[in-house]
């Protein structure tokens, strides 16, 4: 280990593994360490099931009705991939797709007035949906056509809207959309967690709705993908990539000290040895004195023996409970997957309810989601602090990732990756040179 590296990475969470992979591909000499004996850090998938019970201190362990423990891979952090989103682009660029198999998530649902409705995925579905009345549908359709045609580089498509100055609230007003449709659009399509976006310039929201539509157009049923065997496969895929390009991996490796000289990182000490480096990437757990708390997320993992009611017996789905529907500031999310994804025993389903904590009683906050899941065989409750770095790392050359937020997709994680890359490399992370690999995640060439 006593060697000189360009970059040392601590922790094998998804953010760290993707950056390690990209740095290795770019010719950097990388050492990647993790104090845990497994990959994934906060974003790992726990197997066998007995391990999950131990982790949550449920002493009696799983009953026989749960099937074989090793048939389970339970994600600690529930997220799906947007089919046309940034993480899929990163997977394609790096060809990490060859190590993974994906399934399309069967449906996306939204909560309204105590019931759940399918988020319409085609114009036909939108016209048949009970989410809105007839006149509302026509106005909504006009709005969707406007969004689909909108091109920030072509003022002819603006229809009097200024992408940098017109607020999203004003765009909704222009199309005369009612509150329910606004909730649905902002939270189930643009995937905002709160309503703060309403008074921001509309371009970001328009692009988010476009991402949703383009992701949906890719495979049909929903815009989301999920890897067989769980999300823990993602960091491992990027770790393999790093190793192929010469990266060195060490699991179960305690980190004794991060060595600084004149305020700048020069190495990492482990078990009496020092590995030197020019730059360091890590997750917040490795540098508690350089991060600040930015809130909390509650995640409740629920094991079910049945599909969720009113989802058409889907073996995977997402449910969004918009904050307005339950008098909150932040949305509540449910991600559900099952034995169909090789993450649970035959006939079993895993539903994870999560939200940003707003009160002193977080479990009460997710009750509307849990009611949709009854009966629940077993619950595992996790309340996690969210951390972010206190500085940008430009002086210390220590670059820390942010904790994984309550969103049910990886777009915010990818923004963090691009941001860290830019701070480390001094130039923007460029997707353009990724277009060499024009295949989709199922290995079919784009037409």
Swiss-Prot record:
Any one annotated GO CC term: endoplasmic reticulum
Domain of life: Eukaryota
Gene Ontology terms: biological process: negative regulation of axonogenesis; negative regulation of protein targeting to membrane; positive regulation of axon extension; positive regulation of toll-like receptor signaling pathway; protein transport; Rab protein signal transduction; response to calcium ion
Keywords: Cytoplasm, Golgi apparatus, GTPase activation, Phosphoprotein
GO molecular function, one term: Rab GDP-dissociation inhibitor activity
Subcellular location field: Cytoplasm; Golgi apparatus, trans-Golgi network
Tissue-level expression: High expression in brain, lower in other tissues.
Chain positions with Phosphoserine modification: 427
Main location: cytoplasm
Known role: Regulates the GDP/GTP exchange reaction of most Rab proteins by inhibiting the dissociation of GDP from them, and the subsequent binding of GTP to them. Promotes the dissociation of GDP-bound Rab proteins from the membrane and inhibits their activation. Promotes the dissociation of RAB1A, RAB3A, RAB5A and RAB10 from membranes.
Family: Belongs to the Rab GDI family.
Quaternary structure annotation from Swiss-Prot or TrEMBL: Interacts with RHOH. Interacts with the non-phosphorylated forms of RAB1A, RAB3A, RAB5A, RAB5B, RAB5C, RAB8A, RAB8B, RAB12, RAB35, and RAB43. Interacts with RAB10.
Protein name: Rab GDP dissociation inhibitor alpha
Organism expressing this protein natively: Mus musculus (Mouse)
Gene giving rise to this polypeptide: Gdi1
């Amino acid at each position: 280990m006593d060697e000189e590296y360009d970059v040392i990475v601590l922790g094998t969470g998804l953010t760290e593994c993707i950056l390690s992979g990209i740095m290795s591909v770019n010719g950097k000499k990388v050492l990647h360490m993790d104090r845990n004996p497994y990959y994934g850090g906060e974003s790992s998938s726990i197997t066998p099931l007995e391990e999950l019970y131990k982790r949550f201190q449920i002493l009696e362990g799983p009953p026989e009705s749960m099937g074989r423990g090793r048939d389970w891979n339970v994600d600690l952090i529930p997220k799906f991939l947007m089919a046309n989103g940034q993480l899929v682009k990163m997977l394609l660029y790096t060809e990490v797709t060859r190590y993974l198999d994906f399934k399309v998530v069967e449906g996306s649902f939204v909560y309204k007035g105590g019931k759940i409705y399918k988020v319409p995925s085609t114009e036909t579905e939108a016209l048949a949906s009970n989410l809105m009345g007839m006149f509302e549908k026509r106005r909504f359709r006009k709005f969707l056509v406007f969004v689909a045609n909108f091109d920030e580089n072509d003022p002819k498509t603006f229809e009097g809207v200024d992408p940098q100055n017109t607020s999203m609230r004003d765009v909704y007003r222009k199309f005369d959309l009612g509150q329910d449709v606004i909730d649905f659009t902002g939270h189930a399509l643009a995937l905002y967690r709160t309503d703060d976006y309403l008074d921001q310039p509309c371009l970001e929201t328009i692009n988010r709705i476009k991402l949703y539509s383009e992701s949906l157009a890719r495979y049909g049923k929903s815009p989301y993908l999920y890897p067989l065997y769980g999300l823990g496969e993602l960091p491992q895929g990027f770790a393999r990539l790093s190793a192929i390009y010469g990266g060195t991996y060490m699991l179960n490796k305690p980190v004794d000290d991060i060595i600084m000289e004149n305020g700048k990182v020069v190495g990492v000490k482990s078990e009496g040895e020092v590995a030197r480096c020019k730059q360091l990437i890590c997750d917040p757990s490795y540098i508690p004195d350089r991060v600040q708390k930015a809130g909390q997320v509650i995640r409740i993992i629920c094991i079910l023996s049945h599909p969720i009611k009113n989802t058409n017996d889907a073996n995977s789905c997402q449910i969004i409970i918009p904050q307005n529907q339950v008098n909150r500031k932040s949305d509540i999310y449910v991600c559900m997957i099952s034995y169909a994804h090789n993450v649970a025993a035959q006939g079993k389903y895993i539903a994870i309810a999560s939200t940003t904590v707003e009160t002193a009683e977080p479990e009460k906050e997710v009750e509307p989601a849990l009611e949709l899941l009854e009966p629940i065989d077993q619950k595992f409750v996790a309340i996690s602090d969210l951390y972010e770095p206190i500085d940008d790392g430009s002086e210390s050359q220590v670059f820390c990732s942010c904790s994984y937020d309550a969103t049910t997709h990886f777009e915010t994680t990818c923004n963090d990756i691009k941001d860290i890359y830019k701070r480390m490399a001094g130039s923007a992370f460029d997707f353009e040179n990724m277009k060499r690999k024009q295949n989709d995640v199922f290995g079919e060439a784009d037409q």
